[in-house]
Design a protein with these regions (language model features):
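N-terminal basic, amphipathic alpha-helical segments
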Residues: 1-125, 129, 134, 145-147, ...
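Conserved core of the PLP fold type I
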Residues: 132-266, 277-296, 450, 454-462
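Hydrophobic residues in well-ordered beta-strands that form the structural core
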Residues: 191, 212, 272, 343, ...
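Short hydrophobic/aromatic beta-strand micro-patches
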Residues: 315, 389-391, 432-434
Length: 464
């Protein structure tokens, strides 16, 4: 869709003119007057219509792009992009009925973790380390915790050392800290066209521009990354190459090798988010091992152990250590010592390995269940992934399906929440199979989804 005649109503807007234009643009997008994929007027045309300078419109579009409202590409134009976010009712504090099945947020299934946390905290409370754990620690983490982090990272096949590992307050904190260390405000970061929404939040906080890169059924396309890098403006590539969220693709080795060479050729930092990699046995080597001099490898305990631990680990090139440590100091000062100590105990005594094996086995079983119960539907995923994409039949829109599913007592997430591309987002929803505590809840949720797929979309035309 094209709306080259769009002219904002600035009468109700306040502040600098460029910001007023960006605010009006946001208002028209929210109101539905500018749907996703709408092509906007050129800088010059809008400046002529508004009787302002081209520089003012350029600043307005840059501000709108920083907010995640639009994306532009030289030679193609400027387009409205999706701005949906994951709307997990549990995180929003919405009251959930006892029969509601939440498949919205990627969380590992819970088993013996509460009892293990209670036991571990009792042991820490009775240990001689307790007093020290209540004090300030090094910004990068205690030596013992960095050593445990290095051991945990080494499970992926990446060679590292405690000197190259920093302890963070979750994988999300690691993403923001690394991006802060390798970019400046206004820089461009390449990402998959479908990507983890947390990187959008980090980019907005740091005033970074996200440039979506095309994918196929195997993941990121190296030739698309190379084409983007040839423009000379890309400072970093953020990617989830193993059990990608939300597509669950595993990037083949040959593409990883190609990305490493492209990054070297163009001086691009590689930010590898591997929070799901623990679920895959014998997967391809991490990107960080293929281009170690420019790679940042991120993992955490949120998916492998428990989200409430909020402990992450990041492997960095030695020369970048102090910059990432400075970002941690500026944001969290240090990861919570008590939780870091608990994670270290679990890594050292084998508890973490046992939890991983339990989660692997359960996810494989739940994936098999989903494919049996949704047989006949188009599904994208991997047998080891905690999530999958359900592609919707003709007539359904992803947002309408999400709303209808919620009314039927099951939470799913429209692919719009992950989409940064310039065209219409994939007409699919993500199902997170690890969230329900019991497998019987997964069955109940999948039954409701299967029943909804059999209903004609016309029955839900009340969803706007």
């Amino acid at each position: 869709m094209t709306n080259l005649n769009w002219q904002p109503d600035l009468a109700q807007q306040r502040g600098p003119l460029y910001r007023a234009i960006a605010d009006a643009l946001a208002s028209d997008i929210r109101a539905g007057r500018l749907p996703v994929g709408t092509r906007l007027p050129t800088h010059r045309d809008l400046a002529w219509n508004l009787k302002v300078t081209v520089g003012t419109v350029t600043r307005a579009y840059a501000e709108a792009e920083r907010r995640g409202l639009i994306s532009g590409e030289v030679g193609r134009g400027t387009y409205v992009r999706p701005t949906s976010t994951i709307t997990d009712p549990a995180l929003k504090g919405e009251p959930l009925g006892p029969d509601f099945v939440d498949l919205c947020l990627n969380r590992p299934q819970t088993g013996e973790e509460p009892a293990l946390v209670a036991k571990g905290l009792r042991e820490i409370a009775e240990s001689p380390d307790l007093e020290a754990l209540l004090q300030y620690q090094p910004h990068a983490g205690r030596a013992i915790d960095r050593a445990a982090g290095a051991r945990w990272i080494a499970r992926s096949g990446l060679k590292t050392s405690p000197a190259q590992v920093l302890v963070t307050q979750s994988g999300q904190n690691a993403v923001a800290s690394v991006l802060s260390a390798v970019t400046q405000p206004g820089d461009t970061v390449a990402v998959e066209s479908l990507t983890y929404p947390g990187v959008r939040s980090a980019a907005s906080l740091l005033s970074l521009r996200l440039a979506p890169v095309a994918m196929d059924e195997h993941g990121l396309l190296p030739e698309a990354v190379a084409a983007l890098c040839r423009g000379g403006s890309v400072k970093a590539l953020y990617t989830l190459p193993t059990l990608h969220n939300p597509t669950a693709t595993v990037l083949p080795l040959e593409r990883r090798l190609a990305l490493a060479e492209i990054a070297r050729a163009h001086g691009v930092a590689l930010v590898e988010d591997d929070v799901y990699g623990f679920l895959l046995k014998d997967g391809p080597p991490p990107l960080a091992g293929l281009a170690p001099e420019r790679s940042f490898y991120i993992t955490s305990t949120s998916k492998s152990m428990a989200p409430g631990l909020r402990i992450g680990y990041v492997h960095v090139p030695e020369e970048a250590h102090d910059r990432v440590a400075a970002a941690l100091r500026a944001t969290i000062y240090m990861a919570t010592p008590l939780m870091a100590a608990l994670a270290t105990r679990w890594i050292e005594d084998g508890t973490a390995d046992r939890l991983v094996e339990q989660k692997r086995a359960e996810i494989v079983a739940r994936q098999k269940l989903a494919r049996e119960m949704l047989a006949g539907s188009r599904l994208s995923g991997h047998p080891a992934a905690p999530h999958l994409l359900l592609w919707l039949p003709e007539g359904w829109r992803a947002e309408a399906f999400e709303a209808a599913a919620r009314r039927d007592g099951v939470g799913v997430t429209a692919a719009t929440a992950f989409w940064l591309g310039r065209s219409n987002p994939p007409n699919a929803v993500r199902l997170c199979l690890g969230t329900p505590v019991r497998r019987a809840e997964v069955v109940r949720g999948l039954e409701r989804i299967a029943a909804l797929l059999k209903r004609p979309p016309e029955a839900d035309l009340s969803v706007i």
